[in-house]
């Protein structure tokens, strides 16, 4: 989040904290929000008593007699541990951050309000079936029961209050849960930024060069289910996308996941093993909250017995297992967002063209309340002119949103009147024009009904029936059950296009590029008990070229998938165990480096130090472990190779820079086979034409110098974990710019193994060194395996899991950061299941009483 640091740059807050430390009151302030986890508590609204057992990791297992009480208690427990996180995310989802953070988040609120996440969620609420509504309301009632009894909800509330930002939390509602889901859908199903970046790249280097930077999925990587010039000005729209991504932790190539399921035919126990590790932006606290939801006796009144991972703010379990089935989820990466170029009426900007006729856009007015006075923005005069009230220190703004048949116009009002020139797909762009967004998540859906049906499902047919309601975000589901079956299913609304492939903005003034429907559920990719005995997904292509529908052209390039499959295949001839699955989840192999090294190894050096450095690197086992010196040297070389190859053409616009992951790895692999390709030439040098070997030599020389500068002269002191570190930052106050405040909330840096496009997917962003100084280079982890889960069907109590930080969102709670160390060293805790195991491992026992 780039804009929030300005919020707390206030000397008064620093002075307050110092006084609190000196006075000894800081301990009380940080302890007072800690929840009661033992004994008994009256919770009005419950029908019967509920037992909450927490294990040594703070994971609650909830036992209730009705689904009402079960979800009531889940809401209560989420609020105990994570209410600040819930408050922050509901403000993101509803576009209400500026009520707290003022000008710094206004552009993001405008963007979310323009899309209308809350408007769509309100439509979804009207469509809820009785059971789903009942259970969502029970959850909300549990949250509110906790709010009614607590005054100190979190240290964040206290420190913001010291800044004069008093937050009186509103009651939790079903709508808050539904808007929260829109924020997650944005993280997991957006390719709008890809369209906009593609436009910028084509404008900069041309269509052919753009294709070389983003090559198609390679034919030698696994498939899950075998079988022009543009004159658009998209910079403003892309800035809005990136600002929202900064808040949610998404929007770059590290977002993905691994999952796989192995038939009992290949395991030592004869029962299936299922594994999952979703990759999301690094954050504090963890996005996941582990929980067990158990009906004391399964019945129509209480049909749940499930454990796994939930989101604080939503009922149920998103990933996990119940008494009969287990499921894991990875991001499908479908193309479900399209940008349409709308032709506006120059005499009436509220009208747009449809097949030769002017049509009135529907205008919706969104009222945004902003803390403080809004700073005038000459680029956005209509959305920064408001009414300021001195007594409340707030400004009220009116945002008029125009809705086309495709969706909201996402440009600001003055931008809409500007001329977009040129052509798209060979069609001249009329003037004036604007961009409208069509996205499946902006249409009402039934995903929460799907989640709760999934938690209740008892077999493969019920599993598939639950996923029929899973509208967004489209995901890869792997499945196993107690009968020994394994399966795969793609769910979700994936559009069928009359024309086009979703890669670039398309004309919206005719029907030529309309969505004609969605791929029917029964025609979405699936597999059941495949002959190879396993199914693995890692955001790679799920279908081959013969599949009749377009799902995406933006697959992960398959390095992780290839390694997972190779490791499973390598074990054939012996039976796989849980230890094998742990080894796969923690694998640090860099397959791309194996492709690059033969070319680098063939380059000669005159300098004895560089010769020695290259010999050192040649002995590397390609594992990016914490203590690997060669891994450190290779990654320093790798980012230099990317910069030396591409930055001269792409310039200083970091939005265009290739990342260090799969797309760039495949692009470089292809270019290495073309020693005289134009990308190797440095266009800023007039006296020579560089070739592949020249750039390899230059990049290694620079990377070797970086290693000596950053890690010391002796390779004996080099280690990947010294460069590649993870810092878990609180999404708001952890980015305050005040060291004392950040120390309260943030944890790290800690050394991390793995890297981009590696199974242990700890991705980093490339930062271009200022003035080419190696000291500015960073490999800070930006995306992580946000949790790891292994389900053992021979005995559910043998299942294992971990997530990134801890169960608690309260700084200084013992469970705020107690999972960081085992997470980074690929260790696990037991994913307890049976009542006997839960009670035997209980650390605390709380009874919630009506």
Locate predicted features:
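Terminal end segments
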Residues: 550, 554-570, 574-610, 696-850
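N-terminal Sec-pathway targeting helices
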Residues: 1-20
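Stable alpha-helical elements in mature extracytoplasmic
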Residues: 93, 117, 132-142, 284, ...
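Hydrophobic alpha-helical segments
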Residues: 406-427, 433, 469-571, 623-626, ...
């Amino acid at each position: 989040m780039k804009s929030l640091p300005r919020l707390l740059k206030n000397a008064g807050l620093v002075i307050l904290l110092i006084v609190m430390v000196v006075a000894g009151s800081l301990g009380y302030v940080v302890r007072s929000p800690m929840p009661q986890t033992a004994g008994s508590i009256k919770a009005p609204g419950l029908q019967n008593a509920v037992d909450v057992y927490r294990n040594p990791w703070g994971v609650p297992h909830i036992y209730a007699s009705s689904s009402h009480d079960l979800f009531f208690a889940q809401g209560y427990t989420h609020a105990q541990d994570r209410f600040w996180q819930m408050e922050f995310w509901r403000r993101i989802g509803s576009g209400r951050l500026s009520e707290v953070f003022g000008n710094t988040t206004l552009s993001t609120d405008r963007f979310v309000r323009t899309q209308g996440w809350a408007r769509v969620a309100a439509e979804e609420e009207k469509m809820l079936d009785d059971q789903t509504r009942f259970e969502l309301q029970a959850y909300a009632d549990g949250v509110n029961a906790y709010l009614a009894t607590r005054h100190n909800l979190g240290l964040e509330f206290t420190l913001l209050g010291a800044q004069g930002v008093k937050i009186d939390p509103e009651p939790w509602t079903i709508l808050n849960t539904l808007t929260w889901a829109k924020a997650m859908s944005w993280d997991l199903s957006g390719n709008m930024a890809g369209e906009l970046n593609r436009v910028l790249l084509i404008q900069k280097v041309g269509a052919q060069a753009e294709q070389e930077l983003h090559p198609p999925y390679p034919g030698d990587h696994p498939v899950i289910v075998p079988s022009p010039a543009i004159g658009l000005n998209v910079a403003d729209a892309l800035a809005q996308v990136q600002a929202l991504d900064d808040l949610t932790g998404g929007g770059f190539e590290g977002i993905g996941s691994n999952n796989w399921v192995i038939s009992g035919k290949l395991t030592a126990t004869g029962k299936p093993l299922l594994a999952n590790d979703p990759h999301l932006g690094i954050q504090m606290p963890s996005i996941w909250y582990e929980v067990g939801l158990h009906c004391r006796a399964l019945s129509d009144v209480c049909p749940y017995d499930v454990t796994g991972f939930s989101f604080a703010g939503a009922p149920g379990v998103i990933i996990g297992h119940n008494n009969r089935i287990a499921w894991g989820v990875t991001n499908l990466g479908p193309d479900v967002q399209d940008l349409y170029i709308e032709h506006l009426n120059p005499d009436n900007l509220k009208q747009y063209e449809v097949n030769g006729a002017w049509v009135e856009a529907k205008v919706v007015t969104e009222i945004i309340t902003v803390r403080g006075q809004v700073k005038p923005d000459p680029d956005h005069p209509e959305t920064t002119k408001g009414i300021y009230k001195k007594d409340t220190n707030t400004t009220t703004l009116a945002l008029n949103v125009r809705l086309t048949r495709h969706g909201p116009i996402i440009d600001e009002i003055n931008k809409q009147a500007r001329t977009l020139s040129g052509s798209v797909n060979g069609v001249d762009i009329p003037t004036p024009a604007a961009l409208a967004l069509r996205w499946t998540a902006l249409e009402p859906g039934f995903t929460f009904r799907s989640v709760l049906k999934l938690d209740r499902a008892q077999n493969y047919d019920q599993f598939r029936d639950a996923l029929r309601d899973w509208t967004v975000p489209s995901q890869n589901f792997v499945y196993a059950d107690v009968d020994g079956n394994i399966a795969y299913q793609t769910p979700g609304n994936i559009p069928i296009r009359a024309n086009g492939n979703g890669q670039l903005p398309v004309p919206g003034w005719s029907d030529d590029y309309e969505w004609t429907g969605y791929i029917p559920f029964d025609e979405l990719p699936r597999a059941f008990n495949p002959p190879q005995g396993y199914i693995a997904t890692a955001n790679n292509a799920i279908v081959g070229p013969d599949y009749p529908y377009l799902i995406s052209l933006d697959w992960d390039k398959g390095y992780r998938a290839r390694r997972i499959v190779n490791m499973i295949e390598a074990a054939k001839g012996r039976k796989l165990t849980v230890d094998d699955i742990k080894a796969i989840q923690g694998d640090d192999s860099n397959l791309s480096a194996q492709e690059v090294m033969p070319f680098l190894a063939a380059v000669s050096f005159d300098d004895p130090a560089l010769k020695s450095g290259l010999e050192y690197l040649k002995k590397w086992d390609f594992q990016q472990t914490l203590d690997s010196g060669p891994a450190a040297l290779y990654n320093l070389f790798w980012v230099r190779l990317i910069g030396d190859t591409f930055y001269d053409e792409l310039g200083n616009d970091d939005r265009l820079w290739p990342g260090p992951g799969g797309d760039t790895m495949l692009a470089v692999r292809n270019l290495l086979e073309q020693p005289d390709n134009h990308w190797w030439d440095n266009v800023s040098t007039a006296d020579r034409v560089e070739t592949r070997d020249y750039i390899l030599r230059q990049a290694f020389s620079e990377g070797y110098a970086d290693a000596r500068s950053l890690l010391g002269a002796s390779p004996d002191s080099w280690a990947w974990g010294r460069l590649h570190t993870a810092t878990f930052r609180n999404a708001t106050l952890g980015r305050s710019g005040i060291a004392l405040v950040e120390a309260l909330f943030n944890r790290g840096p800690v050394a991390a193994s793995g890297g981009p496009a590696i199974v242990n997917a700890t991705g980093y962003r490339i930062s271009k060194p200022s003035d080419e100084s190696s000291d500015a280079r960073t490999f800070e982890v930006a995306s992580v395996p946000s949790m790891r889960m292994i389900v053992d069907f021979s005995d559910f109590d043998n299942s294992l899991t971990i997530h990134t930080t801890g169960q608690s969102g309260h700084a200084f709670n013992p469970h705020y950061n107690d999972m960081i160390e085992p997470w980074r060293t690929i260790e696990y805790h037991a994913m307890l299941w049976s009542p006997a195991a839960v009670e035997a491992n209980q650390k605390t026992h709380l009874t919630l009483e009506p």
